[in-house]
């Protein structure tokens, strides 16, 4: 290969880079990849200058450096300084540097550079379709491998650039491994294991069962109230004259059926459904199991990733990262929805509103709701207050448990991360560019 051939190849490669959306987005978001493209632009300038000075010029030679540099700058990068453009490379080193771009793209995206479409970063190209499923050779680079037509040494600039890229790739893979091992429970991410927190998860589960039991009891009592003990002369059960002398239909239809059941039961039923999901979540967390459909899916993906990328086959059956972490998300939504659905009146007898315990107690206090039996009136008030107060044990236990939860151990995680980086640096730099493999799997880094 001549310098002229190398220039043509590099121009084609950079043309793909600056026209493929996925690669342009990577330049903007990934400093390591942006540095790779920067080195390629320096090489492009070197080759174009060499071609311009050549005695025998290509007939179709068109310099593109200034255009591509401008597009590089438009992606948020800085313009190349004059001192950066003073490359002095022989043909072998220039070829090595040019060949690094397809390797970098392959290892970042697990796709050949030529498979990227210039019009879309999503739709596969014809090249990608025809090679789909093919067993393509592994791309490797070895700085110590003897070279043909050269002294066997690498220029310091090229060696430093490749070493930095190798370290960035090693750190990326190490981070993905640490993230995955945290997800499956092989790495404990907190400072210590608090037995109190573990049992607090069970206590939270029991307190949610208490809320559920109170909700069911209230549901039975409130329906008995309107089916048997409510006074038909209550304003709640008949049309009311509202603003501008407009009549509003009765909030509760005593004729029975759905028109009676759902208005007085809806808020409690919604609460029960949410409690079902929430209590199951805390029970599974207490057992050290994935506590939601999302975490279950993420755990399986992480196990698959570790098995295929690092040969890890031994996974713990109990994930202590679930057992010793109280999640504020479920606590917040449980308290918020309970208060919104049950503790806030949400209206009055004129405008209407959610017929929750608070609304009905206010209606009873203002004599808008009349109960024929004093005994049942006492029962209704007692069960309503008990239901509204049932959120208190849950709130106290869960908030205290969350505040006392152990904090993540950054030192321990960084120690494991650095060890994996060193292991990756000792491995051959290679990848399989088959787009059907699992190399592009990045397990989530945050526990929900």
Swiss-Prot record:
Query: Region annotation Disordered: residue ranges?
Result: 428-448
Polar residues bias: start-end ranges: 428-440
Q: What is this protein called?
A: Uncharacterized protein MG314 homolog
Question: Organism source for this protein?
Answer: Mycoplasma pneumoniae (strain ATCC 29342 / M129 / Subtype 1)
């Amino acid at each position: 290969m001549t310098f002229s051939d190398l220039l043509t190849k590099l121009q084609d490669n950079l043309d793909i880079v600056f026209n493929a959306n996925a690669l342009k987005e990577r330049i903007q978001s990934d400093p390591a990849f942006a540095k790779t493209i920067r080195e390629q632009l320096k090489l492009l300038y070197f080759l174009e200058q060499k071609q311009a000075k050549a005695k025998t010029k290509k007939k179709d030679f068109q310099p593109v450096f200034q255009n591509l540099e401008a597009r590089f700058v438009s992606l948020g990068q800085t313009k190349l300084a004059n001192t950066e453009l003073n490359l002095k490379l022989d043909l072998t080193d220039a070829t090595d540097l040019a060949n690094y771009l397809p390797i970098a793209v392959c290892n970042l995206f697990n796709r050949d550079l030529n498979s990227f479409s210039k019009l879309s970063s999503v739709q596969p190209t014809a090249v990608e379709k025809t090679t789909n499923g093919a067993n393509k050779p592994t791309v490797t680079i070895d700085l110590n491998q003897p070279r043909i037509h050269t002294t066997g040494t690498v220029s310091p600039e090229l060696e430093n650039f490749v070493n930095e890229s190798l370290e960035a790739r090693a750190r990326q893979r190490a981070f993905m491994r640490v993230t995955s091992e945290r997800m499956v429970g092989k790495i404990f991410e907190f400072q210590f294991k608090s037995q109190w927190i573990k049992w607090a998860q069970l206590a939270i589960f029991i307190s949610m069962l208490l809320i559920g039991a109170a909700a069911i009891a209230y549901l039975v009592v409130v329906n008995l109230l309107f089916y048997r003990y409510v006074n038909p002369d209550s304003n709640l059960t008949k049309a009311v004259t509202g603003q501008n002398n407009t009549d509003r239909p009765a909030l509760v239809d005593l004729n029975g059926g759905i028109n009676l059941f759902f208005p007085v039961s809806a808020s409690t039923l919604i609460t029960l459904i949410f409690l079902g999901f929430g209590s199951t979540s805390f029970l599974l967390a207490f057992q050290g199991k994935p506590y939601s459909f999302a975490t279950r899916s993420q755990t399986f993906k992480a196990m698959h990733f570790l098995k295929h990328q690092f040969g890890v086959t031994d996974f713990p059956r109990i994930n202590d990262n679930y057992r010793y972490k109280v999640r504020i998300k479920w606590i917040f939504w449980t308290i918020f929805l309970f208060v919104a659905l049950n503790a806030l009146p949400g209206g009055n007898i004129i405008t209407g509103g959610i017929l929750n315990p608070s609304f009905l107690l206010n209606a009873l206090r203002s004599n808008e709701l009349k109960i024929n039996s004093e005994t049942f009136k006492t029962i209704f008030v007692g069960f309503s207050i008990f239901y509204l107060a049932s959120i208190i044990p849950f709130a106290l236990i869960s908030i205290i448990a969350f505040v006392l939860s152990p904090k993540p151990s950054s030192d321990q995680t960084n120690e494991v991360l650095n060890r994996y980086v060193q292991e990756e640096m000792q491995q051959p730099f290679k990848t399989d560019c088959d787009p059907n493999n699992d190399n592009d799997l990045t397990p989530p880094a945050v526990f929900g």
